[in-house]
């Protein structure tokens, strides 16, 4: 299993520059069609939440999660011609909310909620691999994941699981080559995020260093008001887990309440994916739009 994401080449550009220079209106629109049956999505409280495009790809391919009475995730694939098609669906009746999602190579992390309990499931495609559990009362509303080179030159995988109250993260780490099975260790928590705005999804993006060994890791927050918030993250020393807001960027052209996510296309390119509505049609014959900035 591939467990690596592309890293932004710090000698050529920066995460901050890529977000700052990205066109933030008039996104390209794509269509996704599905004929694999999904759980019922109808109802005022049911909606898409997170989008996890496959990183290192230019095609409209990846996963979308549903916050519904029965949590589910659909895998979509763009073939030689548009539109993209749903190729697989994973669901569980034990959880009622699939939150914000991100991929690490072929590994997809899916936060799931039920009452005050929370679990993070790990999938490969639509196949379940394993899960980890959050402390009691800590709802897992989004999860972000990346790989980075630490100060000792070791490639690590980093997982951040978001909870609403307080607005902060549990942080887990594992050797990057071992996360096809559960080797995660909780290594701490983050500082709190200020403000009342609702985040739909988060993404971790790694930038290579131009001086020294250790990579720089950024957290990108994607809010339902179509605003992107960039945070720096401390991954070393006594301030490990500290977040500092760097910039905010206003986007428009979709409704991120119905799903949003980030894609690392290459070492010099990132894109934002958004949705604007629930699926149209029947449970076994449906379609929905995707909007792409970048």
Go through each PLM region and give its residues:
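Repeated scaffold domains used in trafficking and secretory/extracellular systems
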Residues: 42-52, 91-102, 135-151, 194-209, ...
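A short beta-strand motif characteristic of beta-propeller blades
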Residues: 28-42, 81-92, 127-135, 182-193, ...
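Intrinsically disordered, low-complexity segments enriched in Gly and acidic/Ser/Thr residues
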Residues: 190-257
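Blade-loop segments of beta-propeller domains
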Residues: 47, 74-113
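Short coil/turn segments that connect the beta-strands within blades of beta-propeller domains
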Residues: 55-57, 105-107, 154-157, 213-217, ...
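Structural motif
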Residues: 66-75, 116-122, 156-157, 165-175, ...
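Beta-propeller domains
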Residues: 2-42, 52-92, 122, 126
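Recurrent small/Gly-Pro-centered beta-turn motifs in extracellular repeat architectures
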Residues: 55, 60-64, 105, 111-114, ...
């Amino acid at each position: 299993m591939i467990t690596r994401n592309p890293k932004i080449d710090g000698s050529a550009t920066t995460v901050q520059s890529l977000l700052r220079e990205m066109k933030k209106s008039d996104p390209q629109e794509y269509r996704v069609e599905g004929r694999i049956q999904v759980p019922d999505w109808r109802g005022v409280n049911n909606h898409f939440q997170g989008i996890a495009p496959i990183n290192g790809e230019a095609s409209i391919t990846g996963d979308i999660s549903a916050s519904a009475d029965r949590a589910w995730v659909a895998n979509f694939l763009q073939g030689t011609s548009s539109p993209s098609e749903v190729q697989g669906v994973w669901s569980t009746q034990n959880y009622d909310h699939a939150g914000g999602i991100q991929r690490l190579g072929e590994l997809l992390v899916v936060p799931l909620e039920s009452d005050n309990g929370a679990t993070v499931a790990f999938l490969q495609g639509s196949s379940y691999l394993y899960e980890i559990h959050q402390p009691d009362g800590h709802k897992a509303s989004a999860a972000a994941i990346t790989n980075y080179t630490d100060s000792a030159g070791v490639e690590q995988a980093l997982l951040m699981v978001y909870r609403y109250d307080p607005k902060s993260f549990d942080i887990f780490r594992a050797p990057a080559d071992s996360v096809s099975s559960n080797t995660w260790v909780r290594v701490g928590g983050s500082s709190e995020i200020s403000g009342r705005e609702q985040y739909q999804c988060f993404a971790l993006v790694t930038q290579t260093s131009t001086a020294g060994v250790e990579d720089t890791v950024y957290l990108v927050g994607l809010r339902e008001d179509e605003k992107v918030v960039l945070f720096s993250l401390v991954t070393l020393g006594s301030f490990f887990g500290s977040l500092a807001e760097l910039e905010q960027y206003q986007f428009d052209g979709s409704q991120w309440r119905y799903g949003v996510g980030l894609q690392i296309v290459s070492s010099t390119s990132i894109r934002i994916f958004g949705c604007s509505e629930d699926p149209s049609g029947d449970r076994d014959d449906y379609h929905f739009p995707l909007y792409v900035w970048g």
